[in-house]
Amino acid sequence: MTSVINVNLPTQSYEIAIAPASLDQIGQSLAGLKLGKKVLLVSNPTIFKHFGKVAVDSLEAAGFQVASYCLPAGERYKTLNSIQKLYDIALENRLERSSTMVALGGGVIGDMTGFAAATWLRGINVVQVPTTLLAMVDSAIGGKTGVNHPHGKNLIGAFHQPRFVLIDPQVLKTLPVREFRAGMAEVIKYGVIWDAELFNQLEQSKRLDQLRYIKPELMDAILTRSCQAKADVVGKDEKEGGLRAILNYGHTVGHAVESLTNYRLLKHGEAVGIGMVAAGQIAVNLGLWQQADADRQNALIEKAGLPTKLPAGLDIEGIIEALQLDKKVKDGKVRFVLPTQIGVVTVTDEVTSDHIRQVLQQM
């Protein structure tokens, strides 16, 4: 069964299609968008080995001229050097303004392909075909693109909305368990910030740590409700002028932890899980949230097989210092997304270094 979610924006609206066994229909899907004939498919070697031929064959059968390029896998390759390689390939293949870059992969591939598309010829089409749970429910939707700077995550980037997002849930069967768990962090996030019903559904599942233990109807709900939540928020605030900031729940401390560990120790979702535990406890200590609800959140994070403690030996003062480089800093103050009840959050700059330190020392 195909679910279609509309992302309605003033600049460019688009569809998210969630359809099992749809990867071999990508050419047909793109043919209806009236794009130019040239396509650059960007992936990584592992993903391309599994799904590259199916995608390329489908695009070529629909009349597209397809070039493909694989970037190395991993957050540490999310750099301007990788973008330069994509520019070189775009130049070699004479990509025009009507051309399209297709991101076939997880969040790293999606972010880099989107940024390359945003900046090549001042902006060409991009289509997102996410292959990880995290990318399906989060990074492929909403137009945030970018790369990391040695001093911080996603400091270099642009907003560039995709023309289309194609989600084939069947590709998750090849996803490593650790990657699946990392994606569950973003799903839990939506339950905390926006969708209490999704949170309740997650609580009712005995296990969340592996795809094979999750009932198909719950997996459908995870994908559709998460994508709908992201579409709702982005539709109300495309460029993070206000409401969209709530999507950064757990990411403030999470990004700092990723940066301090050089993007090598933790998956993004693992860092976000740790960040949600920290933000939840800060909210409790400030009197904004009930401890019982924070405990419910933390139990879900643990049920998903995610860490809830800081990596051993991590410098807490280093985390606090890294927070000053967060994109959400305004007038020198770190803005935190904090829950007030399940499904509702607030954004505040009233969190001090002492508040943060007190919580991190207990983690």
From Swiss-Prot:
Its main location: cytoplasm. One of its GO terms (biological process) is amino acid biosynthetic process. It is found in: Cytoplasm. Keywords: Amino-acid biosynthesis, Aromatic amino acid biosynthesis, Cobalt, Cytoplasm, Lyase, Metal-binding, NAD, Nucleotide-binding, Zinc. It comes from Trichormus variabilis (strain ATCC 29413 / PCC 7937) (Anabaena variabilis). It is an enzyme of class 4 (lyase). CDD domains: DHQS. One of its GO terms (cellular component) is cytoplasm. Belongs to the sugar phosphate cyclases superfamily. Dehydroquinate synthase family. InterPro entries: Dehydroquinate_synthase, DHQ_synth_AroB, DHQ_synth_fam, DHQS/DOIS_N, DHQS_C. This is 3-dehydroquinate synthase. Zn(2+) binds at E186, H251, H268.
